[in-house]
Amino acid sequence: MYGLYEDNSIIGAYCTLIVPYKGYTEGTIIDEYGAEILVRLTNGKEISVYRDEVIIND
C-alpha cells in the first residue's frame, strides 16, 4: 500500500546492465523512481533505466 513505508531500499546496491551503455555495464544504484532507477556507471555517467534492464547484485 502507498501509505506504508518499507525499508527495502536498493539504493547503494551494485548492479549490472543487461544491455551495455557505451561499453559500460557495472554501476551503483543511486535513486529509485518507481519503475525506473538511476544508475551511476563506473565511468561516472548517470543513466535512468527500467528495473528489468539491470541485475541487482546484493
Report residues per predicted region:
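Basic/aromatic-rich interaction segments and small domains that mediate binding to polyanionic partners
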Residues: Y2-D58
